[in-house]
C-alpha cells in the first residue's frame, strides 16, 4: 500500500521521533511505499489567511468559503497545499502522528487540516436535499482510503477510561477520528495510543506499534454510522430513535453497536 504519515513533533530525537522511525521502518519492511510530511521540518504555515488565496482580490473582504472554493476550482491554491492534497490522493492509508497537547493535536497539525481540507476537497461536496446532506461522514474525496492516529500522552490509561477524570480516550479523540478523518470519507482504524510515556518502556511501545503497523490492512475500522445511509433524519442530522441501543446521548451514539454492525453485514 501507499502510506502517508503526517508527523507533528518539533524534536526529531524525541520519543515521538523514535516511534515515527519505528513506524516507517516497519511499514517499509512490510513492502509498503511511505511518504512523510514532517510538518515542523517543513516549517508548515499553520494559519489560514489571504496568502492562501493568491488570486483573491486584495480590496475584497475575505470570505474563507468563497476564497477557498474559487481557489480550489481554479487550481490556484498555494503550492504547499496543492502538494499535500496530491499526497492524500496518492495514499491508500494515512497516519496522523502527534503528541496529545491540551486534549487535542498540536496547532501546526490543526493548521495543516485547516489549510489542506479546502472547500471542494475536504468539504462542500455533494447535493443537499431531503435525502442527502452533502458527501460527508463516510463519503467524500477520501472515500476508499483508510486512516488512523498514532498518539502519545503523559497520563495513565486509567485517567482516560470510562470513569477517568480526563474522559474516555475514545471521546477525547472523537473530534479528530470522526470530525477530521471520517468526515471526508476515510475508514478510521482504532488509534495507537501510548499512555504514561515517561514511565513506559520504549521497547514495549515500539513492539506494540510494530504489531499495529503489520496489521493495517486487516484491522477492522471503527463502525461509525454513515450520514446518508438512512440512520439520520435529514436535514436535522439527528439519529433515529430506533438506533443507538441504550445510549441516550453522546459520541457513542454515532458508532454502531455490535448487534447493529452484524445486522448491517447480514443485510
Curated annotation (Swiss-Prot):
<dbReference type="InterPro" id="IPR029039">
    <property type="entry name" value="Flavoprotein-like_sf"/>
</dbReference>
<comment type="function">
    <text>Ribosyldihydronicotinamide dehydrogenase-like protein; part of the tra gene cluster that produces terrestric acid. The clavatol biosynthesis cluster cla and the terrestric acid cluster tra are both involved in the production of peniphenones and penilactones. The non-reducing PKS claF is responsible for the formation of clavatol from successive condensations of 3 malonyl-CoA units, presumably with a simple acetyl-CoA starter unit, and 2 methylation steps.</text>
</comment>
<dbReference type="GO" id="GO:0003955">
    <property type="term" value="F:NAD(P)H dehydrogenase (quinone) activity"/>
</dbReference>
<dbReference type="GO" id="GO:0005829">
    <property type="term" value="C:cytosol"/>
</dbReference>
<protein>
    <recommendedName>
        <fullName>Ribosyldihydronicotinamide dehydrogenase-like protein traD</fullName>
        <ecNumber>1.10.-.-</ecNumber>
    </recommendedName>
</protein>
<feature type="binding site">
    <location>
        <position position="9"/>
    </location>
    <ligand>
        <name>FAD</name>
    </ligand>
</feature>
<comment type="subunit">
    <text>Homodimer.</text>
</comment>
<dbReference type="InterPro" id="IPR003680">
    <property type="entry name" value="Flavodoxin_fold"/>
</dbReference>
<keyword id="KW-0274">FAD</keyword>
<keyword id="KW-0560">Oxidoreductase</keyword>
<comment type="similarity">
    <text>Belongs to the NAD(P)H dehydrogenase (quinone) family.</text>
</comment>
<feature type="binding site">
    <location>
        <begin position="15"/>
        <end position="16"/>
    </location>
    <ligand>
        <name>FAD</name>
    </ligand>
</feature>
<feature type="binding site">
    <location>
        <begin position="152"/>
        <end position="155"/>
    </location>
    <ligand>
        <name>FAD</name>
    </ligand>
</feature>
<keyword id="KW-0521">NADP</keyword>
<feature type="binding site">
    <location>
        <begin position="100"/>
        <end position="103"/>
    </location>
    <ligand>
        <name>FAD</name>
    </ligand>
</feature>
<keyword id="KW-0285">Flavoprotein</keyword>
<keyword id="KW-0520">NAD</keyword>
<feature type="binding site">
    <location>
        <begin position="122"/>
        <end position="124"/>
    </location>
    <ligand>
        <name>substrate</name>
    </ligand>
</feature>
<dbReference type="InterPro" id="IPR051545">
    <property type="entry name" value="NAD(P)H_dehydrogenase_qn"/>
</dbReference>
<feature type="binding site">
    <location>
        <position position="160"/>
    </location>
    <ligand>
        <name>FAD</name>
    </ligand>
</feature>
<dbReference type="Pfam" id="PF02525">
    <property type="entry name" value="Flavodoxin_2"/>
</dbReference>
<comment type="pathway">
    <text>Secondary metabolite biosynthesis.</text>
</comment>
Amino acid at each position: 500500500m501507499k502510506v502517508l504519515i503526517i508527523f507533528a513533533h518539533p524534536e526529531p530525537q524525541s520519543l515521538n521521533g523514535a516511534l515515527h522511525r519505528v513506524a516507517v521502518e516497519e511499514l517499509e519492511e512490510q513492502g509498503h511505499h511511505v511518504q512523510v510530511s514532517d510538518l515542523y521540518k517543513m516549517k508548515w504555515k499553520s494559519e489560514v489567511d489571504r496568502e492562501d488565496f493568491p488570486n483573491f482580490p486584495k480590496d475584497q473582504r475575505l470570505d474563507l468559503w468563497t476564497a477557498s472554493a474559487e481557489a480550489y476550482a481554479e487550481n490556484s491554491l498555494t503550492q504547499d497545499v496543492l502538494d499535500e492534497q496530491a499526497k492524500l490522493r496518492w495514499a491508500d492509508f494515512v497516519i496522523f502522528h502527534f503528541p496529545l497537547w491540551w486534549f487535542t493535536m498540536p496547532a501546526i497539525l490543526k493548521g495543516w487540516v485547516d489549510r489542506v481540507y479546502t472547500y471542494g476537497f475536504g468539504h462542500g461536496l455533494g447535493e443537499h436535499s431531503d435525502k442527502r446532506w452533502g458527501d460527508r461522514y463516510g463519503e467524500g474525496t477520501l472515500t476508499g482510503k483508510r486512516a488512523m492516529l498514532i498518539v502519545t500522552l503523559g497520563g495513565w490509561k486509567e485517567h482516560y477510561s470510562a470513569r477517568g477524570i480526563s474522559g474516555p480516550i475514545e471521546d477525547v479523540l472523537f473530534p479528530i477520528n470522526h470530525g477530521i478523518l471520517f468526515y471526508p470519507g476515510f475508514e478510521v482504524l482504532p488509534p495507537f495510543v501510548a499512555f504514561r510515556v515517561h514511565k513506559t518502556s520504549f521497547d514495549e511501545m515500539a513492539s506494540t506499534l510494530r504489531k499495529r503497523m503489520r496489521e493495517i490492512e486487516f484491522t477492522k475500522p471503527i463502525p461509525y454510522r454513515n450520514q446518508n445511509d438512512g440512520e439520520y433524519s435529514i436535514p436535522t442530522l439527528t439519529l433515529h430513535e430506533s438506533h443507538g441501543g441504550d445510549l441516550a446521548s453522546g459520541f457513542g451514539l454515532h458508532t454502531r453497536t455490535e448487534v447493529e454492525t452484524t445486522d448491517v453485514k447480514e443485510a
